[in-house]
Amino acid sequence: MTVFTAGMEFFVFHRDRPGSLALRDDLLQEHWSYMDRFATGMIARGPVFTADGENLVGSVHIADLPDLAGGRAFALEEPYYQAGVFRDVLLRRWRNVLGRTMWEFPGGTVGEDDGGYLVLGLGSGPVPDSEATDEMVTQDALVTYGPLLCDDGRTRVGTVALVQAASAAEARGVLGSGNDVDSQYAVVEVYRWQFGGRR
């Protein structure tokens, strides 16, 4: 098991602007070369799609980086971002509750047809532990899981999970169910996701 302790862990969600797919394709090698520089601290990465899997939404990267300045530089100096592929970026500190990378996921590689999802819950509340709160999603189905944090590393502002599930509704269950979710999260977003990196 790999546990990163050297710096700060960050969740970065770059969301594409409409009509940027051709530019994204043109800059793919530059993007990969840029990410190669952060390989030792990479916890998870990959493209994100609409819940039906049909349309590319953007990409996520979860990485261990030296400090706040390093996190901002990682997100904003990325070639796609600099070239205008993305319309916006969500950058937050994050805590690796499971203490592993996506490459250590017991279920193996999560590809296009393997039921991978990004679950993003935004809102305050208690920091979740490593146990999924819905019986439909077990810890073995969690690729990564942890709270989103403010810069101070203490104030929780949400939860992020990459999970393997049979449906978007099942994936959403990692945050809980019914009133529990509604009371803790102002917004819950679920997207399709798959392992990223060099092909």
Features from the language model and the residues they span:
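Conserved, structured core segments of small domains
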Residues: M1-R199
